[in-house]
Amino acid sequence: MDKAKDMIKGTPNIPLFSVIAGSQNKGRGTRGRTWLSSSSINGNLYMTVVFKMSAVPVPLTLMPLRVATLIAPCIQRRITSSSSLYLKWPNDVLIDNEKVCGILIEIDDDNVVVGIGCNVCEAPTVDSNGAEAGRVSTCLSKHNKDILNNVDYDSIVTNTDNKVETLLETHPPLLGLAVDIVEAIDIWLQNKDTPSSVLKDFEEKMTTATQRIRTDRLVDQSLLGKEILPLRLNNDGSLVVRVIDDNRDTTLVADYLW
């Protein structure tokens, strides 16, 4: 994402574009958590898509939800197992309740910078406790064995310069997914959209599994450690949940870790 931000400095009329990295060592997730690529094999997708804020056809509070619904079908088409794909509010993609893709959206002047990380060939180990704690991860190759058969790992591993061109040439699944995502976002920006459509599309894929809130970065600290059940979205994109322990409903307006 930082590389993409550097590219748009001093370029006021730059159109939609994307940057793909072969690996990342300064990656970040929500709430400042780190998001690093594996040191063994460069087989996952790390990309950034940049476009003008003025081109977004829905309120900005709904943009994370819409971006998630655009990326989800690109991943869904690559699942050949009987596994189920869900969206976790506000913009994570899950397969069988395990995280396969994360999305981070930042605003830079009048540009929207969308960072996307998708586990294609391998699922990184995620801490279960501490500041870097997160959901168990999965990868596309676990749900589509053909993905591994279409990768020339020898060329990737011997590419000491880590040139993205070589990575994409030897990794058709990676390139195909990146192209699909960019095309989906581009088509969306060129067409009309409505808040009701965003909410409907997200709720159709939203996970309704009972989960436990584990982050301490909450406005309502009484929710820490509580078991919750996602219920519905408000018009502004915030999430209404039921607190199981207290049998009450409340609204979440910021990302939480569960």
Residue ranges and their predicted role:
Residues 1-84, 101, 148-158, 165, ...:
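N-terminal lobe of the biotin/lipoate ligase/transferase fold
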Residues 47, 71, 92, 117, ...:
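Residue-level signal for inorganic ion chemistry
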Residues 95-96, 223:
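Structural motif
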Residues 110-154:
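Short, acidic (Asp/Glu-rich) active-site segment that either coordinates a divalent metal cofactor
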Residues 145-227, 231:
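Conserved, helical-rich catalytic subdomain that frames metal- and/or nucleotide-binding sites
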